[in-house]
UniProtKB/Swiss-Prot annotation:
Broad class of the protein's primary localization: host cell
Name this polypeptide is given: Non-structural protein 1
Originating species: Influenza A virus (strain A/RI/5-/1957 H2N2)
Subunit-level organization: Homodimer. Interacts with host TRIM25 (via coiled coil); this interaction specifically inhibits TRIM25 multimerization and TRIM25-mediated RIGI CARD ubiquitination. Interacts with human EIF2AK2/PKR, CPSF4, IVNS1ABP and PABPN1.
Any one GO biological process: symbiont-mediated suppression of host gene expression
GO molecular-function terms, A-Z: RNA binding
Function summary: Inhibits post-transcriptional processing of cellular pre-mRNA, by binding and inhibiting two cellular proteins that are required for the 3'-end processing of cellular pre-mRNAs: the 30 kDa cleavage and polyadenylation specificity factor (CPSF4) and the poly(A)-binding protein 2 (PABPN1). This results in the accumulation of unprocessed 3' end pre-mRNAs which can't be exported from the nucleus. Cellular protein synthesis is thereby shut off very early after virus infection.
Keyword terms of this UniProt record: Eukaryotic host gene expression shutoff by virus, Host cytoplasm, Host gene expression shutoff by virus, Host mRNA suppression by virus, Host nucleus, Host-virus interaction, Inhibition of host innate immune response by virus, Inhibition of host pre-mRNA processing by virus, Interferon antiviral system evasion, RNA-binding, Viral immunoevasion
Residues spanned by motif Nuclear localization signal 1: 34-38
Pfam families from the UniProt entry: Flu_NS1 (PF00600)
Region listing for RNA-binding and homodimerization, in residue ranges: 1-73
Domain characteristics, as noted in the entry: The dsRNA-binding region is required for suppression of RNA silencing.
Places the protein is found: Host nucleus; Host cytoplasm
Cellular component terms (Gene Ontology): host cell cytoplasm; host cell nucleus
Gene: NS
Length: 89
């Protein structure tokens, strides 16, 4: 199994968890909530295909994201945000 596939799945699980917390605080609009539901189904399918536990993958994904953020400088983050495409919504 490709390690990048596993890492991508782990990060996707953690980011879904963060988005779920946003929804739980009633901060998401209808398109956000629709994507959240679709992505949950997709993650379940991917987890099954990869034979990975979603809860474990979420914890590892959190560690990956924390490591990246720790290494990321504030200036690089500003540049990344400035170059991100605008949302369609």
């Amino acid at each position: 199994m490709d390690p990048n596939t596993v890492s991508s799945f782990q990060v996707d699980c953690f980011l879904w968890h963060v988005r779920k917390q946003v929804a739980d605080q009633e901060l998401g609009d209808a398109p956000f909530l629709d994507r959240l539901r679709r992505d949950q189904k997709s993650l379940r399918g991917r987890g099954s295909t990869l034979g990975l536990n979603i809860e474990t993958a979420t914890r590892v994904g959190k560690q990956i994201v924390e490591r990246i953020l720790k290494e990321e400088s504030d200036e690089a983050l500003k540049m990344t945000m400035a170059s991100a495409p605008a949302s369609r919504y």
